[in-house]
Amino acid sequence: MTKVTDWEERYQQEDTPWDKDEPAPGLIDWLNKQTLAPETRVLVPGCGRGHDPSAWAKRGFETTGMDLSEIALADARQKYEDLPNLAFFPGNFLEEKPQEPYDLIFEHTLYCAIEPSRRDEYAKALNHWLKPGGLFLAIHFVFPLTEEGPPFGASKEEIAKRFEPGFELLNDWKPRHFEGRRDEEWMFLWKRKI
C-alpha cells in the first residue's frame, strides 16, 4: 500500500528537516556562473518556503514557485514579498499543466519526495511544463532506494535512464551541499529535446 505524505501537516507541525532557510549551495554556485538570457522564465516546483526561487528572482529572472502546501507558500510570500518578479502558486506538478511552458525548471528535493511508482509521471510532467529546448536543472538525492521515505533514494543511473528519452544530458557533477548531505546529492543539467 502506498503511503501518502501530508505536506500541509508536515509544515504545520514544523516537521521540515529539508528546509535549511536558504537556497541550495549548489544552486548558488551555478547561478554565479550561468549565462542565461535575462528574459528566461523559471519554474521551481516543490519550492516549499521559496528559498530556491528567491535566488533566481534576485538574479533578475521572472520566477514562479509552486508547491502543494498553502502554509509553505504563505510563508514564502511573506518572506520574499519584496521581489516583484517572484510569484508563488499552489499546484500539483504531476497533475496540472501550465498556461505557458517555462524556459527553465529547477528542482531540489522534489523528485526524492515523489513515490518511486510515480516517477514516470514526473518525467512526463516536465514535458508539459518545459518548452522544447528548455533547460532542466536539478539537484537529486543519490542514495539507495528504500521503501521508507520521503526522501526516496535513487541512483545516478536510474535518474539518467528516467530522463534520457526526452532530454539530453549536458552536464552532471557533485555540487556544494548543505551540511549533513555529503555524498548524497548530484546535480544534473538537461536540455529538453525538440
Protein language model regions, located:
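Short catalytic micro-motifs in class I SAM-dependent methyltransferases
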Residues: 109-113
